[in-house]
Amino acid sequence: MKFTLALLTTLCASLASAGVVITPVRPNQVIPANSGDCFFGVVTPQGCAPLRKS
């Protein structure tokens, strides 16, 4: 049980540090895109992200 929890925590930390965790953004966080910036989602000051609908 402890090993599984430690493994899961390590995996989550690894994915978060690699930038794999995707956080949807709201329309007021979007900035204008240059050509070729993002092939999916919208551009934010931190990078590309999916746009939250509401």
Swiss-Prot record:
Keywords: Disulfide bond, Secreted, Signal, Virulence. Residues 1-18 form the signal peptide. It comes from the Eukaryota. GO terms for cellular component: extracellular region. The keyword Signal applies. Induction: Expressed in the plant infection stage. It is found in: Secreted. Disruption phenotype: Impairs pathogenicity. Leads to clear reduction in lesion development on cucumber leaves. Disulfide bonds join 38-48. The keyword DNA damage does not apply. Secreted protein required for appressorial penetration of intact host epidermal cells and for pathogenicity. Belongs to the MC69 virulence factor family. This is Secreted virulence factor MC69. It comes from Colletotrichum orbiculare (strain 104-T / ATCC 96160 / CBS 514.97 / LARS 414 / MAFF 240422). The gene is MC69.
